[in-house]
Amino acid sequence: MEKRTEMHKALAQIVDRFKLDWRVLRGVMLTTGAVISGSAALAVLQPGEFVLQDLDIYVTSKNFATVVVFLKEQGYNVQIPTTDVHTSTYPKPNVILTHKNQTGDKIDLIAMTERHVVHAITQFHSTCVMNYIAYYGIVCLYPQWTMHKTGLVRTEWADQQAINKYRGRGFAMVYTPVELPKYERTHACGMHWGCVKARRELHDDLTLFVPFEDEEFNIHTEERMRVGWVLQNEHKCSLEHSG
């Protein structure tokens, strides 16, 4: 309970830091399906570990304009990009609009082409940032690694600057599954919980879900769509067998 309270407090501090009205923001998230992801979600899971420079909000292309209007009402204006600074930061293809307020606080609004945010998040550079905050609570897809400050880099072509950023925040960023905590070399490939070739589901027992105080909503009642993914389908396990 104490850890959960710390997470709620961290979220409140982030919302206050970016001068947003949480009640209104949560309502917008409810109606549009928008979520907060990136470093902000990790900062809620790891309270007090680092200071945020910006906030990432993800939403489907269909509801993009609604969130733009909300940010405008909160004092944020769209910035005209001078360079393509987002090229290696976000999954492709996505549309990104950077917003700033008068005090220079920065919010990136990312329009997803995917049907569900999980399909975008599982394309992130590493598992430690595969988390999000929805109107119903906080979701961490790989808590067995993330909560132990370890991230598996999904691809060798990941942006090194992004990887170094999380190393600087105290995360062990590894490139092979054998470096992960409690990795079992003799596991059944594609079936074991720790195998990167295993199919995961949003509703499976490995996903960490932290509800908000009211508990009116939860991941099981609010996420009706069956959402699954495979982290590294092309990976060759060291001791593959049919199980």
Language-model features, listed with the residues they occupy:
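Short hydrophobic alpha-helical "box" of cullin-RING ligase substrate receptors
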Residues: M1-T5, I121
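Plant-skewed but cross-kingdom recognition/interaction modules and surfaces
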Residues: V28, G33-I36, A43-V51, Q79, ...
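Catalytic cores of NTP-dependent nucleotidyl/adenyl transfer enzymes across multiple folds
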Residues: H86-G243
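Active-site nucleotide-donor binding segment shared across nucleotidyl transfer reactions
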Residues: R17-F70
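Short amphipathic alpha-helical segments embedded in low-complexity Lys/Glu-rich regions
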Residues: M1, Q13-K19, V85
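Metal-dependent nucleotidyltransferase catalytic core
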Residues: V59-G104
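Short, flexible/disordered secondary-structure transition segments
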Residues: H8-L11, V78-T82, Y132-Y135
